[in-house]
């Protein structure tokens, strides 16, 4: 299982939101490039980055930061947040970003998603943010009313290979993750990256037992509740 340490960008700083609330912001590092280097030095194999300004406003105001992070580290990077057209996808891929994560764009416009999957294949990841079993869009602000597991099945039928699934109610709460929903999705034919509330060794161990492809860990690392090096070691030893 791959541990994806998370860098969430807001105003060019590395932050974490609680439950996706832009009014509950905690700055963990004002230098995201330095943070990315720390994660790489601790053994991270893949970095997860989200442009929160982009997710909310559809802009890419943190583009320069993403570029500098890409130039500073050698591990693969996946980037999401406000990517709603092919031009943004192309720009990020040209920059050397390995995977581009679509959220709102995928939920709102399935023909567009199909076109991007046909064109860019496994470089496209879809992020499904769910609240009480329903898909949420626009930086977690709107509820689409779409059943999240049914939507995942639809994405698989379209050829999607990798999915980030976030349980919004759990995100940034340090209360553990929604293992029951991950169990359902893990039975489907898709690489699941679990996100939201991964804050205890127990969560990681349970996700490992389910043969989960990956887990995004953010606040728990910054707050010191989990040690990134230990998590990576646990996963490496489990996979042997």
What residue ranges belong to the model's regions?
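Conserved beta-strand positions in the central sheet of alpha/beta enzyme cores
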Residues: 48-51, 78, 101-102, 125, ...
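Short, acidic/polar
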Residues: 28-40, 84-90, 144-154, 204
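Short, well-ordered coil/turn segments that N-cap beta-strands
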Residues: 1-3, 43-46, 73-77, 97-98, ...
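Catalytic cores of alpha/beta
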Residues: 73, 77-99, 180-214
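Conserved, mostly hydrophobic/aromatic
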Residues: 8, 39, 47, 92, ...
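Active-site-adjacent beta->alpha loops and helix N-cap segments on the catalytic face
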Residues: 3, 54-70, 84-90, 104-125, ...
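Conserved anion-binding
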Residues: 12-14, 19-23, 90, 97-171
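N-terminal beta-alpha supersecondary unit
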Residues: 14-60
